[in-house]
């Protein structure tokens, strides 16, 4: 009998065990689509990014004009640029939904998978930040200045660290050059980490909405979930095309249509929408070092989530109190995002401070307490 190449070839076997014959829980919902959607996002961003990099010039005197040239003179350059800029927004929408899914259904109890995922989020945030600097518009320049300056809050080595990152005494040509190098490199780091993420996931298998072991009822990934994933791909790519073609500048800042000018500060310096929640937490603390620590903690707190799980149940499916708390947390994050987009004045300052306090309070204090309380309720 002829060997089945798909199951025996050293390379095809890996693909087969990951995407075709993978035993998958029979009851996973649409919330489990976002992992593969993130994979498609990454591929789209790498392809459009490579095409843009062929026409981009990483020099302060040429960067802005090279982006303008791309949009005016390169065949479909305007489309490639709009797909790349809005693809980043879709990437973050998918990753936030993916993390929310993991949080709700207790997927974080696969500790290795979860921790690699948090590292992936941090790498993605770094990639998006350095990428935003490349067009060398006003918001690019001042965003880079403000965020890199935060490192100067580190005691003793801060100022040296910032000047080392800048390659001089301000954000200038060396900064732009190294940011381009980093922006080119990091997506490939993300791709590598993604493989590690998947390797750890396939050690344990996927979680499911009930949060219970599903070994007794698994189905092959293909055709059941491959076809379901293709629906997700279609919906996402249609959304991306619609955004890029109908309102490409909806999520951008008009300030970035002005070339970078170190002598004129924009009236409101703010990051892209996907960083606003963290920016609001940064601004909510009047002390510079305190703000930087809170900013770091707002994302690094994800590493603690597996350690703060007190419930006997894995998923929140049958935990109504935790569900209420979860949706309060989501609402709180939306409030932080809105506050981050507003100027730093009354009443936004106090709203931001309350929302920041509540964010940490819910995750560090209320979730563990409610988990214990629900365990008690099980015994009634």
UniProtKB/Swiss-Prot annotation:
Please report the record's description of how this protein sits within the membrane: Multi-pass membrane protein
Q: In which residues is heme b b566 bound?
A: 98, 197
Q: Which residues bind heme b b562?
A: 84, 183
For this protein, the record's Pfam families field holds: Cytochrom_B_C, Cytochrome_B
Q: Bound how, and how many: what does the cofactor note say?
A: Binds 2 heme b groups non-covalently.
Domain of life of the organism in this record?
Answer: Eukaryota
Q: Name one GO cellular component term.
A: respiratory chain complex III
Cofactor(s) needed, names only, are: heme b
Is Cell division tagged as a keyword? no
Q: What is its main location?
A: mitochondrion
The family assignment reads: Belongs to the cytochrome b family.
Q: What else does the entry mention about this protein?
A: Heme 1 (or BL or b562) is low-potential and absorbs at about 562 nm, and heme 2 (or BH or b566) is high-potential and absorbs at about 566 nm.
Q: What does this protein do?
A: Component of the ubiquinol-cytochrome c reductase complex (complex III or cytochrome b-c1 complex) that is part of the mitochondrial respiratory chain. The b-c1 complex mediates electron transfer from ubiquinol to cytochrome c. Contributes to the generation of a proton gradient across the mitochondrial membrane that is then used for ATP synthesis.
The protein depicted here goes by the name Cytochrome b
Annotated organism of origin: Paradisaea rudolphi (Blue bird-of-paradise)
């Amino acid at each position: 009998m002829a060997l089945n190449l798909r199951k025996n070839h050293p390379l095809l076997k890996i693909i087969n065990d990951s995407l075709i014959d993978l035993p998958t829980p029979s009851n996973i919902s649409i919330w489990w689509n976002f992992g593969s959607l993130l994979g498609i996002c990454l591929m789209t961003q790498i392809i459009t990014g490579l095409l843009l990099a062929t026409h981009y010039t990483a020099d302060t005197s040429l960067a802005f004009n090279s982006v303008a040239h791309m949009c005016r003179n390169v065949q479909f350059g305007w489309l490639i640029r709009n797909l790349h800029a809005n693809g980043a927004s879709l990437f973050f929408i998918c990753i936030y939904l993916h993390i929310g899914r993991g949080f709700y259904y207790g997927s974080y109890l696969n500790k290795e998978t979860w921790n690699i995922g948090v590292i992936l989020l941090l790498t993605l945030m770094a990639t998006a930040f350095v990428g935003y600097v490349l067009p060398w518009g006003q918001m690019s320049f001042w965003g880079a200045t403000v965020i890199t300056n935060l490192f100067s809050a580190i005691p003793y080595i801060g100022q040296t660290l910032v000047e080392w990152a800048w390659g001089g005494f301000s954000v200038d040509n060396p900064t732009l050059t190294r940011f381009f190098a980093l922006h080119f490199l990091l997506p490939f780091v993300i791709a590598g980490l993604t493989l590690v993420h998947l390797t750890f996931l396939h050690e344990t298998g996927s979680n499911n909405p009930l949060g219970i072991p599903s070994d007794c009822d698994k189905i092959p990934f293909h055709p059941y979930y491959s076809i379901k994933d293709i629906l997700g791909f279609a919906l996402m790519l249609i959304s991306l095309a619609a955004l890029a073609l109908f309102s490409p500048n909806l999520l951008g800042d008009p300030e970035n249509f002005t070339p970078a000018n170190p002598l004129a500060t924009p009236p409101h310096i703010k990051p892209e929408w996907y960083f606003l929640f963290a920016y609001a937490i940064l601004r909510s603390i009047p002390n510079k070092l305190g703000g930087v620590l809170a900013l770091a903690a707002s994302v690094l707190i994800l590493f603690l989530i597996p350690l703060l799980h007190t419930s006997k149940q894995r998923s929140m499916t049958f935990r109504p109190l935790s569900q209420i708390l979860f949706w309060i947390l989501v609402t709180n994050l939306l409030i932080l995002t809105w506050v981050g987009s507003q100027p730093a004045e009354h009443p936004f300052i106090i709203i931001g401070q309350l929302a920041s306090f509540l964010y940490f309070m819910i995750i560090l204090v209320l979730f563990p307490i409610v988990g214990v309380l629900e365990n008690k309720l099980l015994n009634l």
